[in-house]
Amino acid sequence: MATDLAMSAELPNSPLAIEYVNDFDLMKFEIKKEPPEADRYCHRLPPGSLSSTPISTPCSSVPSSPSFCAPSPGSQPGQNLVNGVNNNNNNSGNGNNNTQGSSGKPQMEDLYWIPNYQHHISPEALNLTPEDAVEALIGNAHHHHHHHHHQPYEGFRGQQYVGEDLSAATNGHHHPVHHHHHHHGHHAHARLEDRFSDEQLVSMTVRELNRQLRGFSKEEVIRLKQKRRTLKNRGYAQSCRYKRVQQRHMLESEKCTLQSQVEQLKQDVARLIKERDLYKEKYEKLASRAFNGGGNTRDPSSGNHVKTTSTDFFM
């Protein structure tokens, strides 16, 4: 903070310098996609410059702040950037009242938003437009002015948060680094879990699931596929248990039916045995009666005749 105050005291209050800074329009610059090895050139300062802004490098999407000792090349159209910075600082509260003068001119500290830009953020991986980059820089500069330390900008999020509003970070809603990543990871996991129901995960084909999971991180995809595999194994186990129970019930019912049939057959056998015994007893009675009757009526003269009669009876 003492360094910032010393720099602001040494900087001139020249109207030409202020006008030169106000005339810068970042909307006409595009985000350049460069290899990551160009990061080592991001933090070099131009020799002889009073500004603490790093030199414009391929890894930066905005030009460097001009030196206040250089003359103004002329007026250029547009003052949108500094006006946005001033409006943002005026709406944020009374934190900047101690550093603003009574003359109504924009403070020099408000113009130093570029040094606060975090160069480790890679804009080409976020599909950001120049308007989003300007909003991010304005919000990040305001946050650093109040808290005096670097914190991540909430607007820079992963590919899976493209649909969310990037302007939420300009309202001062900042959190610590570990809370930031923890909450975002939890919300992403919850959103991915809630996107598919259990029935959809089980019934969906692998090709359709892979098509739906494009754009999500590898860990979340692996976690969701593990959940799908667990649900399918659980469903298969339940199906096997249901089939076993159903088969057991069917076998038990068939066993009961066969046992009843066996009992019926046993009863039939017992009844037939009883009938057989009755017929056998009747036969023995009739046989004994016929034998006794034939023996009493037989005489010597007609023995052959009686014998023939007995034989005819049995026939």
From Swiss-Prot:
Organism annotation: Danio rerio
Pfam families in the record: bZIP_Maf (PF03131), Maf_N (PF08383)
Entry's Gene Ontology molecular function annotations: DNA-binding transcription factor activity, RNA polymerase II-specific; RNA polymerase II cis-regulatory region sequence-specific DNA binding; sequence-specific DNA binding
Places the protein is found: Nucleus
Family: Belongs to the bZIP family. Maf subfamily.
Positions of disulphide bridges: none
Keywords associated with the record: Developmental protein, DNA-binding, Nucleus, Transcription, Transcription regulation
Biased composition (Low complexity): 52-104
A biological-process GO annotation: regulation of transcription by RNA polymerase II
Protein name stated in the entry: Transcription factor MafAa
Residue spans of biased composition, Polar residues class: 298-315
Biased composition (Basic residues): 172-189
GO cellular component entries: nucleus
Keyword Transcription on entry: yes
Residue numbers spanned by region Leucine-zipper: 251-272
Region named Interaction with DNA: 229-243
UniProt keyword annotation of rRNA processing present: no
Residues covered by region (Basic motif): 223-248
Function per UniProt: Transcription factor, possibly involved in transcription regulation during lens development, including that of crystallin genes. Specifically binds to the alphaCE2 enhancer element of crystallin gene.
SUPFAM superfamilies per record: A DNA-binding domain in eukaryotic transcription factors, Leucine zipper domain
Superkingdom of the source species: Eukaryota
Disordered: region residues: 52-108, 169-191, 290-315
The bZIP domain, residue ranges: 223-286
